[in-house]
């Protein structure tokens, strides 16, 4: 299995888009299906574009909705620089749908290393996915540094 974070198109109507989010960092992984509003991927791509602008740069996006009050799952992506050399880290949280009678949802949190050039490609793929409503956006991840 490749180390990656993948956003894959599943379905859309006039209001919402359904995506499958899956991630694997070489040690931990998870996936969920979630719902976002039309155009939300383009907005998220704008937030992530140009990262990192400096060593103190931090970015965060959430897709879907966490908790039992909404249908579908959710993911949260927090990006940061971890050292003076500009190494980048992604903290990913993926939560599954609670289902009809579930009191808890499955959830995974993982840390991932990535290169800024890979994020640039991911951002472009997010924009394409937003406009075409087909395919996937894939962020290639690196083996974790200790």
How should each PLM-predicted stretch be described?
Residues 23-25, 65, 94-100:
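Short acidic, glycine-rich loop/turn motifs
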Residues 11-18, 74-102:
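Intrinsic, low-complexity N-terminal interaction/targeting segments
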Residues 41-48, 90, 119-129:
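Short, structured motif recognition centered on aromatic/hydrophobic residues
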Residues 1-25, 30, 34-46, 129, ...:
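Charged, alpha-helix-forming regions
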Residues 3, 17-21, 30, 57-59, ...:
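One face of beta-strands
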Residues 96-146:
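Mixed-charge, glycine-accented linear interaction segment located at domain edges/termini
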Residues 29-72:
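Short, well-structured hydrophobic secondary-structure segments
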Residues 21-23, 34, 79, 92, ...:
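Preference for bulky hydrophobic residues occupying beta-strand positions
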């Amino acid at each position: 299995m490749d180390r990656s974070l993948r956003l894959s198109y599943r379905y859309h109507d006039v209001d919402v888009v359904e995506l499958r989010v899956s991630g694997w960092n070489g040690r931990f992984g998870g996936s969920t299906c979630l719902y976002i509003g039309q155009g939300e991927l383009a907005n998220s791509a704008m937030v992530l574009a140009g990262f990192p602008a400096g060593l103190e740069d931090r970015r965060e996006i959430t897709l879907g909705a966490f908790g039992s009050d909404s249908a579908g799952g959710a993911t949260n992506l927090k990006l940061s620089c971890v050292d003076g050399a500009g190494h980048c880290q992604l903290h990913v949280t993926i939560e599954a749908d609670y289902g009809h009678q579930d009191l808890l949802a499955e959830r995974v949190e993982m840390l991932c290393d990535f290169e800024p050039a890979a994020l640039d490609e991911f951002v472009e793929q997010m924009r394409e996915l937003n406009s075409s409503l087909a395919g996937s956006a894939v962020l290639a991840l690196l083996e974790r540094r200790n």
